[in-house]
């Protein structure tokens, strides 16, 4: 009975095995059908690697340990092989490039500064009516005009007045116009008898306010009624009356005398077009319009390599090259009339003599071939060279067709364009898969870190002349650095430009296909030979493709204005060799060249970015110099560099490492200050006292006493703890106190009941509450100096009590005179005098500034089929 049971179990197991075998056969048949359908179908789909875990059957678990180990190894090997095959065969679509539209928009939005039309003059000051207070603190009906600051804002917290001047200088640099055309900003003077005009709307509003002021003299009113422009048409000059503070007048007069506009004519526009575009016979350029004599333009600032961002600024350089890459991809033309993917795969199948697409080495040759991948590869190669972005290669060693396509890639693209590790891996795969087996040589065992590449080693060991000759060319394939129109260009080898190098490649491939592959099976030799045959059948198309690649690269390169420095980038652009196979196999005979509009757009974006880059460098250098002279060098330096990077628009400042920030600071420090920016700073420096006096938040010093001092009556404020002069006080300079750190002198004087005056610009706060005055007694104001010894945090309180204050009548009713232990030393602001503030400004009567010079050029191209390369032969000869 036991025997029968054992036999029954064996029969059941046999039946079970038969069923499993049938299922496996059906599964394999269906897999074959699915594979052939997927490879030959027009539909393109992304298929990722299979992640199914191989399930071990219960029978295998129950078997002996040795059998289970063997079975596990077999299944594991099968799984790995299946994954590798699926990766190649089922991968129908190459992941395409997704443009970062935000970066592209940032680049394209950088416009020349002249686009900001000046509608007003530059002003720091404006006249304000201030009340007058009687001796008892009551406000009078009369007012008085003073020059006050237009933007009198000091941030809260510890804030040095010197930082205010640095920010003011930054504001002046931001608003400093490249040109001023007074005619464009002039407005009507409402009080004029003959509809005259004044220079800008602010002058008109000041005149209006003064005219309506009851205390204005009749002579001044009559003068305002006579204010109008004076035109000298024969000299193309116009004079406009303006109301300006003397310092503001100095600024605007300087801007008028140092305008950046230059006369514009057809010759300038002609020379503005890149020379290689002008001389390219494929582009027909016309300029129909004659410019008026009043045409003007601002010459772009295209100085080269002032900061050398390619040298030791890895993060910054990576960002710049990435932006340039995205921009370049947007202008590289799309390929047209590519060979039908389905037709080409069928033809390749016939060439390979494949009766059915079974899982064997030749079937991998057809993987990943589609027009999208071909176009993507074409754009990637050209954009990477234009932006000098480093590329990395992605490939599978068992796909011989990918490696043979890679041989074309390494022939036409200089070695420097690939990251070293990727280049070595690809070359090693080509050597060990194709070259060495052909001659029966042992596999190359390459040591990581070897200064020589696998191709260098192979060149020395290969005896065949044609193969060694091709290896020699690839090993020495580097960009030639040529300066054209003052710009460093990375130029391709002439043999690549004219396509002759492809013949050299084909000679080497033919030699390899004729070899016996003595150490390899016949199938291996046949696979390599058929792969070479597929590529050699497209010799003419490959020559054309190489010429097309070189022509588009060099034509777009003519529009680059910054030196093309070649340094390996931190990140790389991935290029799959299957997409290179797509490009080689699907390239048709349709020529594509950039349209003139695309070229002009690319050129304008490059010019605008480069010019803005240099202008922002000038600003940063000027502010660093100003910070140094204002003793703010340590305090503000990193913020200045961060602002500089923000104004270039393309950088994510928070992600830039500190070491690169400080290296950038050191480079900026070495550059000279531009003369206009230096003159403007000197103007501010010479008039710091006037600016301080006009502010309601900056004092010229503080008086500290041990005993309380009475608040005194002031015509501008009422009862106030202000000192208008320092007569009779011992004076100590705040700057010297900070430098020396010797506070004993102040302490001794205060203990001896002698008031001391600390002289220097410092911010103060205003309080008009009597209650707070009683509560504070101002002891905290100088405690910081005596105890904490921080002069830069000193911020005295100015107590202002008058009929506008909340607690004024409390003081008036009790006839109480408040006291304070500190007095703010504040000089009287400059009084407004109409006669001294009236200035005549002179500018051209009219001129027109043109920002887009290429708008005057009408451009067209020859028929693409007739387009010729540098050797005066058609780019695409294979028709």
Curated annotation (Swiss-Prot):
One GO cellular component this record assigns the protein to is: viral nucleocapsid
What segment(s) does the record annotate as region Disordered?
A: 1-52
GO molecular function terms listed in the Swiss-Prot or TrEMBL record:
RNA binding
Task: Map out region (5-fold hub) in residue numbers.
Answer: 1-79
Q: Where is it localised?
A: Virion
Instruction: Name the site position(s) for Interaction with the intermediate capsid protein VP6.
Output: 219, 223, 227, 838, 840
Q: How is it modified after translation?
A: Sumoylated with SUMO1 and SUMO2. Sumoylation of viral proteins seems to have a positive role on viral replication.
One Pfam annotation reads Rota_VP2
Q: Where is this region: Hydrophobic?
A: 393-413, 421-441
User: What family, per the record?
Assistant: Belongs to the rotavirus VP2 family.
Does Metal-binding show up as a keyword for this record?
A: no
According to the UniProt entry, the coiled-coil residues are: none
What does the UniProt keyword field contain? Capsid protein, Inner capsid protein, Repeat, RNA-binding, T=2 icosahedral capsid protein, Ubl conjugation, Virion
The subunit field of the Swiss-Prot or TrEMBL record says: Homodecamer; each decamer is made up of two conformers of VP2, called VP2A and VP2B. Interacts with a VP1-VP3 complex. Interacts with the intermediate capsid protein VP6. Interacts with NSP5. Interacts (via N-terminus) with NSP2.
Supply the name of the protein. Answer: Inner capsid protein VP2
Any notes on this protein's domains? Answer: The N-terminus binds RNA. It is necessary for encapsidation of VP1 and VP3. The N-termini of 10 VP2 molecules form a cylindrical hub underneath each 5-fold axis of the inner capsid.
Question: What does this protein's UniProt record list under function?
Answer: Inner capsid protein that self-assembles to form an icosahedral capsid with a T=2 symmetry, which consists of 120 copies of VP2, with channels at each of its five-fold vertices. This capsid constitutes the innermost concentric layer of the viral mature particle. It encapsidates the polymerase VP1, the capping enzyme VP3 and the genomic dsRNA, thereby defining the core.
